[in-house]
Amino acid sequence: MKNTLAYVCAVAGMTLATLQVQAESLVDGSAEAGKNKAITCAACHGAEGVSANPLWPNIAGQSAPYLVAQLKAFKDGSRENPLMTSQAMMLSDQDMADLAVYFEGLPGPAQAVADADLIGKGEALYRGGEVTNEVAACIACHGPSGAGNPAAKYPALKGQHAAYTAKQLRDYASGERASDGKTRIMRDIAGKSSEDEFVALASYVQGLK
């Protein structure tokens, strides 16, 4: 009972701490300059920031603080991906800010369809977590609609490719992705979760709008 109560209190505290998405960007960049610099990005992420490959993320509408944080992580090696690292190495801090503000301002991906057989399980995990293993609810950091928390650099998840999201959860669980830093929040959560839960969650957030 004590463990359950502590879990519920922790989730409630995280939920209260989550800030609403702000209309004005928290990053000092130029969307106009970013548009001119985004030509290379379009090869993988699409001209409008919506990727045709489900293993490459949609970045349209993603918060600028999160995008900058990930570009810096690719550049300094704290997040590994040969293709992205080679691109990030060529970017200055201002380049990153400009690109992030540009993509943040684009309309997010159109609502995708979640697997009807997985919606129930995915929604339960997203909104309620998993008490037995003390896995916090995704809603606490990523918000009711999956819009994320720009100030805390928690990404928007709504409309993201299910295949990409599931892969990131697997990578966090294995430790291959460690860009959650010293908090280890995503590695800890993913490490307590199963493959079935990854798939259900990923499908559910793909269908959020």
Where are these regions (language model features)?
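Gram-negative bacterial Sec-dependent N-terminal signal peptides
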Residues: M1-Q22
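Electrostatic cytochrome c docking/interface patches
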Residues: V21-A38, A52-L55, G105-T132
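The feature marks the first
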Residues: L26-G77
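Stable alpha-helical elements in mature extracytoplasmic
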Residues: S30, K37, S63, Q70, ...
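The canonical Cys-X-X-Cys-His
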Residues: G34, C41-A47, L99, V135-P144, ...
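Sequence context surrounding c-type heme c attachment/ligation sites in exported
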Residues: K35-I39, A64, V68, G129-I139, ...
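Axial heme c-ligation environment in periplasmic c-type cytochrome domains
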Residues: A52-N58, F74-A114, P150-A156, S174-L208
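Surface-exposed interaction/gating patches
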Residues: A110, D117-G159
